[in-house]
Amino acid sequence: MTGTAVSNEAGVATTRTVGDADMPTAGIVGSLREILSDLVRYRELLMELTRRDITIRYKQAVMGFGWAIFMPILIVLSGFLVRFAMSQMSGRPVGAEQLAGIALKGVAWSFFVGTVSFATTTLTSNSNLVSKVYFPREVLPLSALLAQTFDTTIGLTALVFVLPFLGVTLHPNLLWAPLLLALLFLITAAATLFLSCANLFFRDVKYIVQVLLTFGIFFTPVFYEPAMMGPIGSKLVLLNPIAPILEGLRMSVVENHNLITPLARTTAAGHSVIVWTPLGLLYSATVATLGLIASALIFHRSESAFAENV
């Protein structure tokens, strides 16, 4: 077993061990272990590529890190306008609680959209690295994920100072927020790995992704609550695995609800609608876990064909 030093264009020297570790490992568990081992071994490269992505994003930008909150603000303002228009039609005013929910869900949705949009093309836009230098290709979409996480952290920090003005106070159910954000991170990671891999083999994937992200906000409860869609409509909306996460954020942070307890309400039309059920959280967690495992395996087992398709 020998070690071979290689250098990549990000400026990080890495070492690849040639020998038994390079032999294909049978089984899903073995493949996952190999993926994690490679990511740990190349963690410095992952961090360097993340720093590169952040630097490129803000280099010579007049607004600087202000761009990190521009997209969330744009989404939130759009949500405010939509809810205001809906309130004018229904005759029910929009309260601070609704605005707080839109702001919180808008930042979370912006993280998903920004990451997927940027990460889908990471393999094709880094063709020089993919075709010439050995490293686990997973670090390319994951570096985009971490760079967007940096941006979202800035947005969430700003939101922390805004929410108290919208009536959100300190309470124990705020502890649900980190768990829900972690689930969103996992689902986003699964999407970035799968879509970046798919886009390498089918270049029109990036256009399909842009269309889905553009119209996806209308099928995701960012500007509205699922209960507004009625008993059947709310169930359909919550089939989107991101929907229970966004609603969980609103229910726990804004409404101070314990997500373990189911909650039902009666609509203006007299229909009883389930506003929250912990099964939704279980559903999202299952999709996040299985989706990440599946996308990681697909990505890993397709790597051998990356260089010839880049």
Where are these regions (language model features)?
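Hydrophobic transmembrane alpha-helices and immediately adjacent juxtamembrane helices
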Residues: M1-V310
